[in-house]
Amino acid sequence: EILVMGNEPEWENALDTDLCHADGEDYRAFLNEFANRLTTWKQANGWTFDIYAGALNRVSELPKSETVPAVVSVVNNNPNVVGLDLHVHALKINQAEDDFRIIRDKYGVTKKLICTEFSMVRALNPHVADALGEWGTKHGYTAGMKIYEYLNLIAEKANAGTPVSATEFKSLFESYSWYPKNWYKTFYEVFKKYDTYAITGRFS
């Protein structure tokens, strides 16, 4: 079992829109206090979950963030914290490794890494209203159906117990030039390279 303290605190703790300026010292103190109290409660109640800090997002894109080093400091120095959680919503496939590399190499994190969110949402969002086009007519849909309409439809089918095939789903996205090829394979290799302990992802 895992408990993560925080959810993309670069956003929660930001003092302005650049996501860099924040009360890092106050947040560091909060996380340390939270981790220590959680540990006391664990011992009192016989709980066995592991405590992680995080979940850091866009680490490689926010080199001046005051929140990132605060969180990393807690991970590196508080013995009650097992590791760090990363959320990796990369825009381009070559960004898949960036956050992991910086956390390990620049910040010297040697404890466990987990990734409780990774997705291609930032690559997909600009295209959700794109039409299915020729692919749609070939697969029993209309050419004018939008990607978001297709996704809603197949979600309904899946909930009804009649999901579309993996081959169909994959072929749609491979028909678009913007789709980052080998997206999940690339992430899988990155997770292995950086010895990621636990991973959960989503499509968007």
Protein language model features and the residues they cover:
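Structural recognition of the beta-strand scaffold that forms the well-ordered cores
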Residues: 2-5, 50-53, 83-86, 112-117, ...
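Short, flexible coil/linker elements and helix-boundary hinge sites characteristic
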Residues: 45-46, 108, 140, 161
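Substrate-binding surface in catalytic domains of secreted glycosidases
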Residues: 81-144, 173
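Substrate-binding cleft of secreted/luminal carbohydrate-active enzymes
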Residues: 118-124, 129-204
